[in-house]
Every structure is written in C-alpha cells, then in structure tokens.
UniProtKB/Swiss-Prot annotation:
NCBIfam families noted in UniProt: PRK00121.2-2, tRNA (guanosine(46)-N7)-methyltransferase TrmB
One Gene Ontology term of the molecular function aspect: tRNA (guanine(46)-N7)-methyltransferase activity
Gene Ontology CC terms: tRNA methyltransferase complex
Coiled coil: none
InterPro entries: SAM-dependent_MTases_sf, tRNA_(Gua-N-7)_MeTrfase_Trmb, tRNA_methyltr_TrmB_bact
Protein name: tRNA (guanine-N(7)-)-methyltransferase
EC numbers: 2.1.1.33
Organism: Mesomycoplasma hyopneumoniae (strain 7448) (Mycoplasma hyopneumoniae)
Record field: catalytic activity: guanosine(46) in tRNA + S-adenosyl-L-methionine = N(7)-methylguanosine(46) in tRNA + S-adenosyl-L-homocysteine
Length: 201
C-alpha cells in the first residue's frame, strides 16, 4: 500500500521535540530501530524500558509522524526520531548502541537490487560500527528468501547468529515479542515470521 504524503509531517515531528539534531550522540543505553515505520513496536519497547533510550530511524517523515500518537499514549520521554536513510547513519550518529532492530525491511526481491537489501555487506559494516562489543542485531521479516540471504550475508561478513527461527510466534522468544503494525497484518493472514539475533565477532 502506497504511503500517503503528509506535507507538514516533519514540522509536526519537530513540534513534539522528537526530532534529533545530527550528529546525535548515543551510548550503550540506546536501542535503534531502522525502518521503524509508524513506530508501534519501538514506542512500546520505550514504554516497557524507561531506563533505556530509543531512536527510531525512518526515511519517510509521513510514516514517522504516525508515531506521535504512541508518544502521547505512553507519555514517552525516552523516544526520539531520526529522518535518515540507513546508508547515512555513520554520519548522523556518533557513539555505539546496545541493540539494532531491522523490522520488515524491503526485501528487494529482484537479483539486480541485492545491494539495496539492509543485510547486504555494506550495511552490515555500518551496524558493526554502531554497536557496542557483543551488541545485538535483531531482524524480523516475512520474506523467507530475504531471510536466507541475510543469514548467508551475516555469516560471510564476520557475524555470529546466536538465535534464529522460521516461526517467531511459536518460538522461545515469542513471549517478549512486540508486533509491528506490518507484522500484525501478516500474522492475521497466517504468515510465518522469520527472526534472528546476531553479534559481530
């Protein structure tokens, strides 16, 4: 479904004091979600973990602005937004995070577009530079081929997969899983969600 353009989206995010100024300094209390969309999952994580800080990275202001309703619902003071493309993150963020989430990124299914996938080696280098030692990269996707590509890419580029499942909602970690808006849609259609955790070694 095409994202509806909201002309004043960036202004509305700024007015809520959610937009970070770059370069933004972080430390190991920070958790980052790349491609947060409407922010449902990360805002719930922020509410559940008030002693940690959360940064939602989203390329499109018209998607990110939707997170405002969750900020108000949970009265969050530990959640912020960065409007950025993933490839620019090392210029936008200074410091190292505890965890990076990749939630349902575009799988770019055509072979000629493989370098655009967020688990391609160039992006994995960025995440490695943004994570503390033993920091965790977490991936959720409904696309099996993309998941398999991601597993191979991680293994080939210095990462160790510490957990993986092809059925997140019937797995050991499901009890702590928070669904994204996109995830809820696919679960209702009985799609299986693939999930992994990895560290850079």
């Amino acid at each position: 479904m095409r994202l509806r353009n909201i002309p004043d989206a960036l202004e509305r995010i700024q007015n809520q004091n959610l937009l970070v100024k770059t370069p933004w300094n972080i430390d190991d209390s920070w958790i980052i979600e790349i491609g947060m969309g409407k922010g449902k999952m990360i805002s719930q994580l922020a509410f559940d973990n008030p002693n940690k800080n959360f940064l939602g990275v989203e390329k499109y202001p018209s998607a990110a602005v939707k997170s405002i309703k969750y900020v108000k619902k949970y009265n969050l003071s530990n959640f912020f937004i960065l409007i950025s493309d993933a490839k620019d993150l090392l210029d936008q963020i200074k410091g190292k995070a505890n965890t990076i989430w990749l939630t349902f990124p575009d799988p770019w299914p055509k072979n000629r577009h493989y370098k655009r996938r967020l688990t391609y080696k160039d992006f994995l280098k960025i995440y490695a530079n943004l994570l503390v030692k033993d920091g965790i990269l977490k991936l959720k996707t409904d696309n099996l081929k993309f998941f398999e590509f991601s597993i191979e890419s991680l293994k080939e580029n210095g990462w160790k997969i510490t957990y993986q499942t092809n059925d997140l909602h019937n797995s050991l970690v499901n009890s702590s899983n928070i669904k994204t808006t996109y995830e809820e849609k696919w679960v209702n259609l009985n799609y299986k969600i693939h999930y992994l955790e990895a560290i850079f070694i």
